[in-house]
Regions:
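Intrinsically disordered, low-complexity regions enriched in proline, serine, glycine
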Residues: 96, 106-107, 145, 165-167, ...
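Conserved catalytic-core segments centered on acid/base and nucleophilic motifs
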Residues: 84-86, 96, 206-207, 219-220, ...
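Small-residue (GG/TT-enriched) beta-loop-alpha framework at ligand/catalytic clefts
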Residues: 22-67, 206-207, 213, 228-231, ...
């Protein structure tokens, strides 16, 4: 039995079940390399067309790798830009401003606004315009004397499937994720532009992107060589820069005939559909079966914050059913509630105290259970097993994307990847394992060792502002 998951003081039955679970969640390095290769196949097929089998959506953006030059020009001109993030449910938005000044740090302001009783796209955009006006006045973003000279560019970003219809416009494609229905087929730039005009605001929408694209742009501002971005939030997504001439599905367009490298929103959550390479466990199948989008976003359900805690809860309830954890007279009803074990609880894998006090405090406060030292070890082990499986899967997927991004370069060089999202601050072991795995599999694919940068929880609102400078 692996000593990594041997529980001190546990019975043979307890240790045996922990090890059985660890074995089922274990993935060899060779299998991870195969997964990376499959991701590469899915990307290649996705660039061919939207109806290809074994393909990721690979949504093409008008944002180009050369946006670093556009940002550099904006710095020279001491430009101002606004960024707007709209969340999936249209109940919350974040606004940011970026102002470049000579010989001093960039001036960045951020503010969150709540949306109320949004029943349609027009109402959403009108509320957004009102909040933008409030933001401009509160932070004095646009000096009064310059408001009649030139509109301030506004970049909009949203964490939904987005088809960019022009350099400034984009329509949300509501896929299997829950999103407000009125998003479907609405051109956000046109809708918001009309609302801004209605309020006589000196602001013009110049770009509309998915959050994973604006995250990559934000990363380029700090690390100009960035070619790939990974978001680890409630869901998962990744983007990279691809040679426009290597994208068959846009070959007849002006963009497809250019020499530019353009941003690709991979929609990585979809990976694994039409494939058996991921080999989900019975607990993963249970999560999928009980989800609102059964059969979709297969990869996301194995690795994303939204689902990791629920996988752990299902494992704990199996221990409960076998009467191998917690006192028999304990009230464990909370554990029976779906999604009651939040993924944020999995930070307990970092508890290094001799008695695992943090684990015990969590179980007492969150579930009203006085857990023994053995119980605490079991719960921490289950969190670690689930988190490390997820991190290794993500690392393998990133390696596959790195291979594709490297092939798109004019001259191959070490790939620079930025990671953003809640998990970068919430679960350091997860992020570290993701990076280590990506480097390991990249080496197996004979790629130069990639460079990783952590962008933090929210880079995409500032990235949206920077995207507005795109030419």
């Amino acid at each position: 039995m692996s000593s990594e998951y041997t529980i001190d003081g546990a019975s043979d039955a307890q240790n045996r079940l922990v090890q059985e679970i660890a074995d089922k969640f274990s993935i060899t390095d060779e299998h991870l390399a195969e997964i990376a290769g499959e991701v590469h196949v899915y990307l290649t097929n996705g660039l061919r067309g939207d109806s290809e089998p074994k393909a990721l959506p690979c949504r093409v953006s008008y944002i180009k790798a050369a946006i670093t030059d556009d940002i550099r020009d904006a710095k020279k001109n001491q430009s101002i830009a606004l960024g707007l993030t709209i969340n999936t449910s249209a109940q919350r938005m974040k606004i940011a401003s970026v102002k470049f000044t000579h010989a001093s740090p960039d001036i960045i302001n951020k503010q969150v606004f709540q949306m109320h009783n949004v029943a349609g796209a027009t109402q959403m955009c009108e509320q957004a315009a009102t909040h933008i006006a409030q933001f401009i006045n509160t932070h004095d973003v646009v000096p009064t004397e310059s408001r009649r000279i030139e509109p301030v560019p506004l970049g909009v970003t949203i964490d939904l499937a987005l088809e960019e219809t022009s350099k400034s416009g984009g329509r949300v494609t509501c896929d299997s994720r829950a999103c407000a229905g009125f998003f479907r087929d609405v051109d956000i730039a046109q809708c918001l532009g009309a609302a801004l005009l209605k309020q006589h605001l000196p602001v013009r929408v110049t770009s509309t992107t998915n959050c994973v694209i604006s995250t990559m742009v934000a990363a380029q501002h700090h690390f100009p060589s960035t070619c790939t971005a990974l978001i680890l939030n409630r869901g998962i997504n990744a983007s990279y820069y691809e040679s426009a001439r290597k994208i068959p599905k846009i070959s007849g367009s002006e963009l497809g005939q250019s020499s530019a490298r353009v941003a690709i929103n991979t929609e990585l959550a979809w990976f694994g559909e039409d494939s058996d390479i991921l080999k989900p466990t019975m607990w993963d199948h249970r999560i999928d079966r009980e989800s609102s989008n059964t059969g979709f976003h297969v990869f996301e359900k194995l690795v994303a914050d939204k689902y990791l805690g629920e996988i752990v809860r299902n494992l704990v309830t199996d221990f409960m059913d076998a009467q191998l954890i917690f006192p028999r007279d304990a009230d464990v009803s909370t554990f029976s509630e779906p999604y009651s074990f939040f993924s944020s609880y999995m930070t307990i894998i970092e508890d290094a105290s001799s008695d695992l006090r943090e684990v015990g405090d969590l179980l007492r406060a969150g579930f009203n259970v006085d857990a023994s030292y053995v119980d605490r070890q079991i719960v921490r082990a289950l969190c670690h097993i689930v988190a490390m499986r997820a991190a290794r899967l993500v690392g393998a997927a990133v390696a596959g994307i790195i291979k594709k991004a490297t092939e798109a370069m004019d001259s191959p060089e070490p790939a620079v990847i930025s990671i953003s999202g809640l998990l970068t601050e919430m679960n350091q072991p997860y992020v570290e394992c993701t990076i280590d795995t990506a480097k390991l599999i990249a080496a197996k694919l004979e790629l130069d060792e990639p460079v990783f940068n952590i962008l933090g929880e929210d880079g995409y609102t500032v990235g949206a502002a920077l995207s507005s400078f795109s030419k």
